[in-house]
Amino acid sequence: YNMFEALATLAYDGPRQDFARRELLAALKMEQEEGLTPSQMTSSWAGAFGHTQFEPTSFASHAVDGDGDGKRDLWHSPADALASAAVLLSNAGWTKGAPCYVEVTLPAGFAYEQADTDTTKPVSDWKALGVKRPNGLDLPASAGSGAIYLPAGARGPAFMAFDNFRTVLKYNKAAS
């Protein structure tokens, strides 16, 4: 999609008009500052673009030249896209070396209403409830607290999500 057409459509008629207007203005600024043409600025139907699906306002705040060619090109340079995503995650609170999530097994009789990324408990509390790692390794107590995440529902795999997982959700709210 043409980024300007996508964002203008959403700014005119959509549930998030104010958001789309901000993104459209940021896209116009990006076009001017980066020396791009509208035909170069392709996006999803919602205006996200490049290898890592940045939004124009995120580009303005977090995009970097990861390959040293003097440009911030998230469409064609994986190095620029990944370095920019790393900057965005770092600025959003990513803790280097801390886990994002680990797979866990839940005990029989687990109260599934506790499985919600907003319901956090100290790792020691989850352990006391019988939550453990399937591989026999210890739960990462250094992570402090975690939440049980069931991306495929109660019959699918279970994960314990930590602060870095919530940081990823700031980047992209789709947890599936």
What are these regions (language model features)?
Residues 8-10, 87, 166-170, 176:
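Short, hydrophobic/amphipathic alpha-helical patches that form generic packing surfaces
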Residues 14-17, 34-38, 92-96, 133, ...:
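Short secondary-structure junctions and interdomain/linker hinges
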Residues 38, 45-49, 55-156, 162-165:
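Flexible, glycine-rich surface segments
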Residues 3-7, 115-117:
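Short, surface-exposed, charged loop/turn segments at secondary-structure junctions
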Residues 5-31, 65-67:
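Acidic, His- and aromatic-enriched active-site or binding-groove loops in soluble protein domains
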Residues 1, 27-32, 85-86:
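Short, functionally critical alpha-helical segments immediately adjacent to catalytic or ligand/cofactor-binding
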Residues 10-11, 31, 62, 89-92, ...:
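Generic structural signal for hydrophobic core residues of well-folded globular domains
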Residues 1, 13-24, 48, 52, ...:
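Solvent-exposed, acidic/flexible segments
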